[in-house]
Amino acid sequence: MEDDAPVIYGLEFQARALTPQTAETDAIRFLVGTQSLKYDNQIHIIDFDDENNIINKNVLLHQAGEIWHISASPADKGVLATCYNKTTDSRVQACAAVWRMPKELESGSHESPDDPASTAQTLELLCHLDNSAQGNVACVVWEPMGDGKKVISLADSHILLWDLQPSSSQAVLASSATLEGRGQLKFTAGRWSPHHNCTQVATASDTTLRGWDTRSMSQIYCIENAHGQLVRDLDFNPNKQYYLASCGDDCKVKFWDTRNVTEPVKTLEEHSHWVWSVRYNHSHDQLVLTGSSDSRVILSNMVSISSEPFGHLVDDGDISDPEEHHAEKSKEPLQDNVIATYEEHEDSVYAVDWASADPWLFASLSYDGRLVINRVPRALKYHILL
């Protein structure tokens, strides 16, 4: 059972920002933001044609500045948010804005990646998440499964909840909270939990993970020294409401139960340098992706702490032949393991993410502008499904 070869797409600029087009559930589409100091920055809309194993692309100009983070609206295919650097009077400020892509590009196109006649189009600015008083924005996260009207931005030591007005033409600050403590505390990453009616957000600052209740903007849990060095990213298990994964500069990936934060449930130590990105599969939460500046992407099978630790159990009533019953998967917990290590990158991998339209497909992005699309090995896919 031979697996498909990875598909590689090269951007002409350096890049570190990647997101799936979250609201698109039919086509496989990713958005990539570039980092160039000399030239106009771009957002590449990457369409993956699964049947023919080829990439089609469109390019949007992002003239506001180099892109450090990108996120897509969960409700509107055409809307996205970027965090970007703006230089004024030799001062660099990290800003955030919400944009709309041209209508005809929301559902992709069939332009060849090598078409020299293709011209870049511009984004329409919908609103700034004006944070001049709060500091530099690290990331913008959308309320999951929402109507695309609520976002949170993390700016230095502030967590800011915004309400986007109709057609996203204005962002109104609904509430905020500030990190308290010694020293220069700054947020590095955040994720909005899909559980608890979307009322919880987790943030990373230095080596600490914190949970926040968005209704009161108060802290609900705190995991101090979650990592030995800076925490780079985190993600919520989509199927187990108290489970959270984090990664950091100590080369580790840790899994937490937020009801008991004294120690991690599990720790992975497969990378040899900083781990920049961790992502749970949206459907099969035992599949966990990580990307690191050791230039590798690792796909792990964390089945023992997943929502199906015994595999896919079949109800006795579904089995007509008792002989078949013995052929069913055993009721013993399955073993955690590294499924595959992907080594198509030659530079630091800053972002990994799953496609929103296909649970078996994922993309990774390294700083040299190389985007790689890979699939979960077929043997494992059928093992999970059957």
Swiss-Prot record:
What top-level branch of life does the organism fall under?
Eukaryota
> Which InterPro entries would you find in this protein's record?
EIPR1, WD40/YVTN_repeat-like_dom_sf, WD40_repeat_CS, WD40_rpt
Q: PTM N-acetylmethionine: list the residues.
A: M1
Any one cellular-component term (Gene Ontology): GARP complex
Phosphoserine-modified residues are where?
Answer: S320
WD repeat placement: 132-172, 182-222, 226-266, 270-310, 344-384
Q: Does the keyword Disulfide bond apply?
A: no
Please give the PROSITE patterns that the UniProt record associates with this protein.
WD_REPEATS_1, WD_REPEATS_2, WD_REPEATS_REGION
Biological process terms in GO annotation: endocytic recycling; positive regulation of dense core granule transport; positive regulation of endocytic recycling; positive regulation of retrograde transport, endosome to Golgi; regulation of insulin secretion
Keyword GTP-binding recorded = no
Q: Which SUPFAM superfamilies match?
A: Putative isomerase YbhE
According to its UniProt record, where is this protein located? Golgi apparatus, trans-Golgi network
Tell me which PANTHER family the record gives.
EARP AND GARP COMPLEX-INTERACTING PROTEIN 1, WD-REPEAT PROTEIN
Family classification: Belongs to the WD repeat EIPR1 family.
Q: What does this protein do?
A: Acts as a component of endosomal retrieval machinery that is involved in protein transport from early endosomes to either recycling endosomes or the trans-Golgi network. Mediates the recruitment of Golgi-associated retrograde protein (GARP) complex to the trans-Golgi network and controls early endosome-to-Golgi transport of internalized protein. Promotes the recycling of internalized transferrin receptor (TFRC) to the plasma membrane through interaction with endosome-associated recycling protein (EARP) complex.
- Quaternary form? Interacts with two multisubunit tethering complexes: EARP composed of VPS50, VPS51, VPS52 and VPS53 subunits and GARP complex composed of VPS51, VPS52, VPS53 and VPS54 subunits. Interacts with SNAP29.
* Name by which UniProt lists this protein: EARP and GARP complex-interacting protein 1
The species this protein belongs to is: Mus musculus
The gene from which this protein is expressed is Eipr1
